[in-house]
Curated annotation (Swiss-Prot):
This is DNA ligase B. Transmembrane segments: none annotated. GO terms for biological process: DNA repair; DNA replication. It is an enzyme of class 6 (ligase). It comes from Ectopseudomonas mendocina (strain ymp) (Pseudomonas mendocina).
Length: 562
């Protein structure tokens, strides 16, 4: 059935295959992993080329093939042929001129390619399905899908239902055109909207036996080459416009340098186009006659893709970050990937139930994209390793708002999170004190730092006299912070200051009814406040602050107030 343009992917060994480290696997596991990923890619190929479905984004598919190619280089048992993308995609109809592929060059290689050539032109790389149009005496004789580049399916009947494909030319010419059928889009910005599923829509329509008038009108045509047309690009474009293919001239621009190419690439990426595009195509105006073309990447044209919107990352481990309130957040530790000039090595999953529903394990490959252009997020699980590594999950019952006031192996995450909050702007606002500071101090309890003097600080690795003096000054300032600020820093529940604050001894004597009498404090809030102020560890911290001379923790004269 359908055969589209994904087959160009393996024509250039890309950065993943060159730079990604080899997995630390025994040969037996390497063979199993290679076979499993190879089978998955073959299934994607079949869905894409033969069923008209696109179960995975092109950029992720490319990265999966690149990774498989890297594994093939890494392990002797995996040195078997890579899956052939076009297996079974060839149709019964021979192309009069083979459909060539395109090498995809990265930013570094594109400058060298341009610098060694002249008579260059640039076009948007329209994201649709490729087609060959054959005209006899000016009438549409045949439309052929790309297939394997040599043979494709007969799309003639469906092509005649497309208003964008002229069934009769202004002149009685015999000619062969190659182009792209695309889904018409309004107000489409590639940088904002991505592919928008446009290619899959065209593929699905062309797989049907009948098209409605509405569906047919939604499909456009961009002719990107006339293999046996006039020798010069200018003349080819001029004649194509005269024949009714005006888009060819409108979207083909001469360039003289990589700077001009970059400008057009950015322009088409960030400005409105009537179609989706996944990069640009650079062509030499002069190229061999069509009789010499082959179904492989030519030397006279290359593709320069837009920046990837998704990266395919290998999960190295599943960690669990525990916040100061005891919330457990699964974090995938990734083999580092680059996305939009950012190096990404971790991505949070939100919650343990989310992780369990996804069942992500080490060795799996996941799609990562940037949310709001800054925060990496997991988009989907693309491929699961056949080796389902066990993952040790923290017990949710062990972590809550009143756990981990002291350092221990199982409490390290929450304990450090408490310290980070304590010194932050929301807490005591200690200048120059942050997570890095706390991790360098040998603390067993949350407030042990109050007892460290300058000499003790200076004796610690990485802390010199100047830094020790800075820390001592910050710690001294903490003693002067008011009670309200200290309670916020210790993590007191909301409502602790409702109706005004007494001293610490009065707060820890309050009962549930006392809290309920405070404005804005309901039953749940009263329960949380009572649990906090009556907790033995919290009361121990209060005594420690009393001994340190912090003002709000000293008893006031007179009877306590409720």
């Amino acid at each position: 059935m359908l055969a589209m343009k994904r087959w160009i992917a393996p024509l250039l060994l890309p950065l993943i295959a060159q730079a990604e480290p080899c997995p630390d696997w025994p040969d037996s596991r390497a063979q199993v992993e290679f076979a499993a990923l190879s089978q998955q890619i073959a299934q994607w190929d079949d869905a894409y080329h033969n069923q008209g479905r696109s179960p995975i984004a092109d950029e992720l598919y490319d990265q999966a093939r690149e990774r498989l190619q890297r594994w093939q280089q890494c392990f002797a048992p995996a040195r078997q042929p890579l899956p052939e993308p076009l297996t079974g995609s060839a149709g019964p109809i021979a192309h009069p001129v083979p459909q060539t592929g395109l090498r995809k060059l990265n930013d570094a290689a594109i400058g060298e390619w341009i610098g060694s050539r002249d008579d260059l032109w640039i076009q948007p790389k329209v994201d649709g399905v490729a087609v060959t149009l054959v005209y006899r005496q000016g009438r549409l004789h045949q439309a052929i899908s790309r297939g394997d580049g040599r043979h494709g399916q007969d799309w003639s009947a469906r092509a005649r239902q497309l208003p964008a494909v002229p069934t009769r030319l202004p002149e009685a010419l015999d000619l062969v055109l190659q182009g792209e059928l695309y889904w018409r889009l309004e107000d489409h910005l590639q940088a904002r909207d991505g592919g928008a599923g446009a290619r899959g829509k065209v593929a699905g329509m062309m797989a049907r036996h009948e098209l409605s008038d509405t569906d047919g009108a939604a499909i456009g045509l961009f002719v990107w080459d006339w293999p046996d047309g006039p020798a010069s690009m200018d003349e080819r474009l001029s004649q194509l416009q005269a024949l009714g293919f005006a888009d060819s001239q409108h979207y083909s621009k001469p360039i003289r340098s990589v700077e001009e190419a970059r400008q057009w690439r950015q322009h088409w990426y960030r400005h409105r186009l009537p179609f989706a595009s996944d990069g640009v195509v650079l062509r030499q105006g002069t190229r061999p006659a069509g009789a010499r073309w082959q179904a492989e990447a030519p030397h006279w044209a290359v593709a320069w893709k837009y920046p990837a919107s998704q990266a395919l990352a290998v999960v190295q481990a599943v960690d669990f970050r525990i916040g100061r309130s005891g919330r457990i957040t699964p974090v995938l530790r990734l083999q580092p990937v680059d996305l939009d000039d950012r190096r990404i090595s971790r991505v949070a999953l939100g919650s343990v139930p989310t992780w369990k529903s996804l069942d992500v394990r080490p060795g799996d490959q996941v799609a990562i994209r940037l949310a709001g252009l800054t925060i990496p997020r997991l988009d989907s699980v693309i491929w699961r390793s056949p080796h389902r590594a066990p993952v040790e999950v923290p017990r949710s019952a062990d972590y809550h708002a009143l756990s981990c006031w002291r350092s221990s192996p199982s409490c390290q995450h929450q304990f450090q999170a408490r310290l980070a909050w304590l010194s932050s702007k929301q807490g005591l606002a200690l200048s120059g004190v942050g997570p890095g500071t706390w991790s360098s101090l040998p603390l067993q309890g949350l407030l042990d730092w109050l007892e460290l003097d300058k000499a003790q600080l200076q004796s610690l690795p990485g802390i010199g006299p100047r830094r020790a003096a800075q820390l001592q000054q910050a710690f001294a300032q903490a003693r002067d912070r008011p009670l309200q600020q200290w309670l916020r820093a210790l993590g007191a529940p909301p409502g602790f200051d409702a109706g005004g604050l007494d001293d610490w001894p009065s707060l820890i004597e309050r009962q549930r009814d006392d809290w309920l009498r405070r404005p804005g404090v309901g039953p749940k809030g009263a329960d949380r406040l009572l649990a906090f102020f009556s907790h033995p560890e919290v009361q121990r911290l209060g005594r420690q602050l009393q001994q340190a001379g912090v003002a709000g923790f000293q008893p006031q004269a007179g009877p306590p107030r409720s």
